[in-house]
From Swiss-Prot:
It holds the Pfam family DHBP_synthase. It is an enzyme of class 4 (lyase). Pathway: Cofactor biosynthesis; riboflavin biosynthesis; 2-hydroxy-3-oxobutyl phosphate from D-ribulose 5-phosphate: step 1/1. The record marks H136, E174 as: Essential for catalytic activity. The lineage of its organism: Bacteria, Pseudomonadati, Pseudomonadota, Gammaproteobacteria, Enterobacterales. Mg(2+) 1 binds at E38. Its EC number is 4.1.99.12. Binds 2 divalent metal cations per subunit. Magnesium or manganese. Belongs to the DHBP synthase family. Its cofactor is Mg(2+); Mn(2+). This is 3,4-dihydroxy-2-butanone 4-phosphate synthase. It comes from Photorhabdus laumondii subsp. laumondii (strain DSM 15139 / CIP 105565 / TT01) (Photorhabdus luminescens subsp. laumondii). GO terms for cellular component: cytosol.
Amino acid sequence: MNQTLLSEYGTSSERVEHAINALRDGKGVMVLDNEDRENEGDIIFAAETMTVEQMALTIRYGSGIVCLCLTEERRQQLQLPMMVENNSSPFQTAFTVTIEAAQGVTTGVSAADRITTIRAAIADNAKPSDLNRPGHVFPLRAQPGGVLVRQGHTEAAIDLVSLAGFKPAGVLCELTNDDGSMARTLEVVQFAKLHNMPVVTIEDLVIYRQAIEQKAS
């Protein structure tokens, strides 16, 4: 990871704190994984606070695959089958079947419709019949234990929104460049500056969580 590009966002722990505070303020954050992993930056929002405008921005600048990160408990509550029985993807990305709100949407593709679907999925009393399958929102199941178990954007989203005091549900989408290629560290930092978002790495979050657990033990 190019630490020079990230140094203006503070130390490792400060970057995590900035991200937590941004989420509390209803803003988005940029999360980078390691260069030897996916080497991608994801736009992440707390599912509870994400607005239609923020969804529109995410669709406009992201890959278009907008994912809803959920816990295993929530996946079971919604009775969402995993997308495949045997996951052969290199990083074991845990997609479930795709979803759409059963009510209040048209085609399900618009920013407003995707927010409606997310709201339906994370409602406290949500039940399987509240969602149609397939749809235009891609749920991801996070590993219990978060980034301390799997250093993925899915787990980072759940950890960050939980640290910010929200229910464990986050929305993410990979940032792409204008030519459709994946944004790397430099482009992620440029985008973050333009849209007033903090930047944090998954490695930062691992160190932060390890420190919390060490203090607690």
